[in-house]
Structure formats: C-alpha cells, structure tokens
Amino acid sequence: MKLIRKDIEKDNAGQVTLIPEEAEDMWHTYNLLHVGDSLQASTIRKVQTESSTGSVGSNRVRTTLTICVETIDFDSQACQLRVKGINIQENQYVKMGAYHTIELEPNRKFTLAKKQWDSIVLERIEQACDPAFSADVAAVVMQEGLAHICLVTPSMTLLRAKIETSIPRKRRGNCTQHEKALEKFYEQVMQGILRHINFDVVKVVLVASPGFVREQFCEFLFLRAVKQDLKILLENRGKFLQVHSSSGRKYSLTEVLCDPAVTARLSDTKAACEIKALGDFYKMLQHEPDRAFYGIKQVEKANEALAVDTLLVTDELFRHQDVPTRTRYVRLVDSVKDNGGTVRIFSSLHVSGEQLNQLTGVAAILRFPVADLSDEESSSDED
C-alpha cells in the first residue's frame, strides 16, 4: 500500500489518499472502510446519450465519484472490493443522491474521509504501508491424494490451490497402480507450487503431512527438478522446510505454524507472533486457567484491574456496524496499551483469527489472577 496524502486534524477528522498495490492491500482497504465514510475514486458509469437526431444510446465512461458508503462487499478469494453508496458531489454524469457502486482496484488511488479516525484504523494504514509487512510464507499441507497450497501473509491465509485425487490402495505383490496414481498426484502438486508460489517474495515453503508423505514428495520434487532442469526449484531448495501435520486439510496449517521449527524460522513475521500468542493463551488456559479469559466483559474487568498482559482480538470486531460497539473495542485496545500491555490484532482471514473468533474474538492473558473473574465467567452474557 502506498500513502499519497494524509490530512487528519486534531479532532481526528480528515482524509487519506492511498494506492493499493497488491491483493492483500484490498483486504486492508476493506478493514479501513465503514458505513458513513466518504469515498472518492475513479469508476465506470453507464450513461445515456441523445444524438442530434433524437436517438438514445448508452456508453460507459470513466469518471471520479465521491460517495457516502452504505454497503461494503469483499470477495476474499478474488480480493475484489465493491463499495455501494450515494453520490454526494456534483458530477456531469451522475446526479446528487444517485446510487453507485465503486469497484476499488489495485494501482488506482482512492481518497477516504472519516469524521473520526480511530487508533486501530491508523495503525492498519501504518502497517499496510510498511514494506516489512509482506507475504513471505507458503505452505503445502498434504496427505496421500489431498493437498492444499496456501500463502500465509501477515493478514490472511490464502488458499491458492486444492488438489484432490483418488489413490488406489496397495495390493500384495502389485503396487503399480498405487505408485502411478501417487506420482501423478505429486506431479499436480509440483505444478501447483510452480504456478502459485513467487520465490522472489516467499522466504520459506512449509511442506507438511502425516507419515512420510512430505519426505516422499520432496524427494520426487527435487529429482524431477534435476531431470527437467527446473532452476527455480533447485535455486530455492533451501527454502523448503518439512514439518509434521495430522492431516492434509487446511485446518492443519494451524498446528504446522505452531511447530517450534517453524516459529523459529518465521520469528520476525506478524503471523508467527499471532500464532505464538494464541498458543500461549491455550497453554495458560490449561495450566493456569485463572490467568486466561475470553469474552468482552471478563477482559474489560481484567483490564480495569490493570491485569491484562496480552490482549488478543480479531479485526472483525472493528468492522462492527454498531458504532458504540466498535468504539468499545477500540477503547479496550487503547487502554491495554496505555497500561503497558501487548495487543495482538488477528486477521479473521488467518487460521489463527478463525480460531480466536470461536472464542468470541477477544481474549486475554493476565499478569495475575483477578478475584471474582472466574465466578462471573459462567454467568456472563457476551455482547
């Protein structure tokens, strides 16, 4: 993401102009937008024209519109973002008050104005515009006949390919059909890696499986690379890291990212920090349950007692349509930071964020136990 201009007043009203440069930037943009914001961008509008003879025709024109945002639609797989609202500035093609849908596109600037820019949104802009926050992890989670090729970015887990094929069982004295099907499967996975992994960006490729599937696949992969002179694979052989997983399904990526060998390799990435924080929370919940709580009421009470050491919260909560609810979570984050705590904001499109959402989307590791908090947990109504 490229920041072109930032004009925010002391009362936190103002506007920013940004250019999304890659697919993940569309996800960041989705998280910046809220109903009631003002969005200005270049867009296509179908307009009717009347010729001198009186015949009416229509054509598509590119124009710049400013709309008041009413609905926001994001396709996470295609990374497409469509924003619908009413036109609030005079335009030669579109009447004031007319509805229009702007499709935001990579490499095309937009200006976003808000009456109130909160700390969460401003921090997201800062991170999105920081080159250090880039996608640098790929993962192949596999078992015989099933593989998922994913890109793990700081903000999301993107499924790039799912390969599924039937592998006949081994038969006593005749393994030919099994071996042929397995080789064909490995070939499909190899082609998926070549098609979907950009080795100029990716620093590590995790190959995970139960049993010996990962070893057998990597042996096949690099023998085939030598045979076919696939230099892209041979030159990046050192980036491949084999790890255990319980299955070849996408959800197994969570356990893969918790593997000590993986966390050591990915120690500087935001994704690794989130995985570690969630792992620490589960350990605390198991061994010292009076220092690990989830749910907004419990966490707020712990924060009032200055007990929150680490706050875990999903970005989905900051997209809440109800402004007071959204503000409540922003205040919690700001307060924890002011009290010296650490805040980890999880992406709801990341496997760790999906898990945290199952725990209400907000959790905390405490510095010390808080009296009466455990008693309230069982009777608390979550908002």
Swiss-Prot record:
Top-level lineage group: Eukaryota
GO cellular component: cytoplasm; Dom34-Hbs1 complex
Pfam annotation, one family: eRF1_2
Main location group: cytoplasm
Keywords: Cell cycle, Cell division, Cytoplasm, Metal-binding
InterPro entries: eFR1_2_sf, eRF1_1_Pelota, eRF1_2, eRF1_3, Pelota/DOM34_N, Ribosomal_eL30-like_sf, Transl-rel_pelota
Molecular functions (GO terms): metal ion binding; ribosome binding
One GO biological process term: nonfunctional rRNA decay
Cofactors required: a divalent metal cation
Location(s) in or outside the cell: Cytoplasm
Coiled-coil regions, chain positions: none
Function: Component of the Pelota-HBS1L complex, a complex that recognizes stalled ribosomes and triggers the No-Go Decay (NGD) pathway. In the Pelota-HBS1L complex, PELO recognizes ribosomes stalled at the 3' end of an mRNA and engages stalled ribosomes by destabilizing mRNA in the mRNA channel. Following mRNA extraction from stalled ribosomes by the SKI complex, the Pelota-HBS1L complex promotes recruitment of ABCE1, which drives the disassembly of stalled ribosomes, followed by degradation of damaged mRNAs as part of the NGD pathway.
Cited NCBIfam families: pelota
Family classification: Belongs to the eukaryotic release factor 1 family. Pelota subfamily.
Quaternary structure (record): Component of the Pelota-HBS1L complex, also named Dom34-Hbs1 complex, composed of PELO and HBS1L.
Name the record gives this protein: Protein pelota homolog
Species in which this protein is naturally found: Xenopus laevis (African clawed frog)
Gene designation per UniProt: pelo
